[in-house]
């Protein structure tokens, strides 16, 4: 399947969407931390590197350096997708996805999840967003996903052999990266053949581990 996007609504600048893997990860992390840890947001460079290299709730797991993250932040800033916030103790970074891509809060959260974890089902997005946005049900998730698709920011990936549900993926990466991501997910089997309740429990445990990692990172940075 090729990556194609059609838009019935106004679309953001195409150049702004040609993001590499590091830029995709940075935006996803900034969106996530704004929603789950507002008291430490915007993020320092050190905190953002830790978030990017987090072992849970990330697909794929990455090992980025401060130099890589810093360079990508500047590139994103030039596209209007991040902003440097000067501070008395440390400079911090925030995303501008809502303004740069003209998204409402629900769409920002879904975009962040897709940036962090690749193609996902509606139920996965509903479960994983519970700490970030109050979606009443899966229909609300689908409605916002359809609006992202109409903007050319996401696409529906029909279920493949061995999969039970369709998936949705973002279209913010460069074409080559998106094709690689799509190919990898199409070849992957359904995540566990466990029940929805079991998968929900796994997501809950991942969220708890992520929260512990965030707390540890804050303690370490406080000692710097």
UniProtKB/Swiss-Prot annotation:
Protein name: UPF0502 protein Psyr_2419
InterPro entries in UniProt: DUF480 (IPR007432), WH-like_DNA-bd_sf (IPR036388), WH_DNA-bd_sf (IPR036390)
Signal peptide feature range: none
Regions crossing the membrane: none
Family: Belongs to the UPF0502 family.
PANTHER family: UPF0502 PROTEIN YCEH
SUPFAM superfamilies xref list: Winged helix' DNA-binding domain
Pfam families per record: DUF480 (PF04337)
